[in-house]
């Protein structure tokens, strides 16, 4: 089932972000990874089912672009063969490795080519935008919220990745606490409604489409 996380701020360390990721280690017990970039932070907890080699670990990169996905892409081998004929090369047998090539070929229309259940976060370095999306049926969970300290958006597979729980019992955290726990004080924690996608560009904010 895996776990994905993303945060658009730069006020949280990778180590602290990984602590939030590890709260749901049962979703991704095989491996965990956190990366930093112009977009902020992105994390993945792996439950290895397909593409079991190290090359199947996410985030998947092509240049400065990257993606994490909790999902299953049915019939992905058909799309993969089409992409291979168009010159794309693949390092693993993981279904989610085709996501960036699909995005390059079709942009946001990529979802029309996906017979799948998914929750994903993708960074496009050329347009400097972060894209979060969820499958039309809503099988794979994806929550989001905004940090009180910097008003940056965060996404995660489970609510507990985004809230501090017992570690912040005060109604309004102190400035020191807020600085160390930007994800601990989320304004709202709705689940992204299916079908759903959001694009984010600094510093202009967000645009959403449902």
Could you tell me what each predicted segment is?
Residues 1-210:
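Cysteine-centered catalytic environments shared across enzyme families
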């Amino acid at each position: 089932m895996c776990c994905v996380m993303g945060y658009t701020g730069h006020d949280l360390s990778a180590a602290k972000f990984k602590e939030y990721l590890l709260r749901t280690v049962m979703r991704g017990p095989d491996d965990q990874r956190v990366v930093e970039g112009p977009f902020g932070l992105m994390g993945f907890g792996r439950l290895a089912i397909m593409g079991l080699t190290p090359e199947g670990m996410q985030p998947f990169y092509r240049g400065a672009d990257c993606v994490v996905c909790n999902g299953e892409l049915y019939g992905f081998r058909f799309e993969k063969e089409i992409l291979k004929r168009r010159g794309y090369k693949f390092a693993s047998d993981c279904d989610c490795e085709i996501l960036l090539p699909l995005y390059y070929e079709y942009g946001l229309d990529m979802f029309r080519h996906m017979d799948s259940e998914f929750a994903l976060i993708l960074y496009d370095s050329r347009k400097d935008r972060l894209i979060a999306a969820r499958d039309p049926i809503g099988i794979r969970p994806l929550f989001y919220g905004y940090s009180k300290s910097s008003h940056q958006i965060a996404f995660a597979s489970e609510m507990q990745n985004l809230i501090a729980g017992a570690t912040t019992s005060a109604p309004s955290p102190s400035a020191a606490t807020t600085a160390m726990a930007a994800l601990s004080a989320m304004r709202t924690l709705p689940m992204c409604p299916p079908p759903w996608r959001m694009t984010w560009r600094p510093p202009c904010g967000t645009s959403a489409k449902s």
